[in-house]
Design a protein with these regions (language model features):
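Residue-level recognition of specific faces of alpha-helices
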Residues: 17, 21-24, 43-46, 68, ...
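Short, hydrophobic secondary-structure boundary micro-motifs
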Residues: 34-35, 55-58, 100
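Hydrophobic pocket/interface hotspot
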Residues: 14, 40, 47, 88
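Generic structural signal for secondary-structure transition and capping sites
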Residues: 30, 45, 49-53, 74, ...
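Arg/Lys-rich, positively charged N-terminal/basic patches that mediate binding to nucleic acids
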Residues: 1-39
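Short, charged, surface-exposed hinge/linker loops at domain edges
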Residues: 39, 46, 62-65
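Enriched for short, Lys/Arg-rich terminal
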Residues: 1, 71, 75-103
Length: 103
């Protein structure tokens, strides 16, 4: 098992996206929103170990360095690994269209 630990940085855009997802849910179910917030942060923190375990965002075109981490139930953290740092760029709801990320 790879013992290397990576530094995980969350972009302002990803933070805004996460806040929007949690805030939207909080309007109807504050407890579920808090669970979502915790789940998102746990998933993102897990990238400190073996971030390469996750698939590429676009498996057909690996020229793009972006990878995706599925965070139950419906979210994806989109990130790139550069040296010993993981840069989380986006947090998207996988039920919605996110093909614009592939362009």
């Amino acid at each position: 098992m790879d013992g290397q630990r990576y530094r995980v940085l969350i972009s302002n855009k990803a933070r805004q996206m996460m806040k929007a997802h949690v805030s939207f849910l909080a309007e109807v179910n504050p407890q579920a929103a808090e669970k979502l917030r915790v789940s998102l942060m746990e998933g993102i923190r897990s990238l400190a170990q073996m971030p390469e375990r996750c698939p590429y965002l676009n498996e057909e075109d690996r020229r793009s360095p972006y990878r995706k981490l599925h965070i139950p139930k419906w979210y994806l953290a989109i990130y790139v690994v550069v040296d010993d740092t993981v840069y989380v760029e986006y947090i998207v709801d996988a039920r919605q269209e996110y093909g614009w990320l592939l362009r």
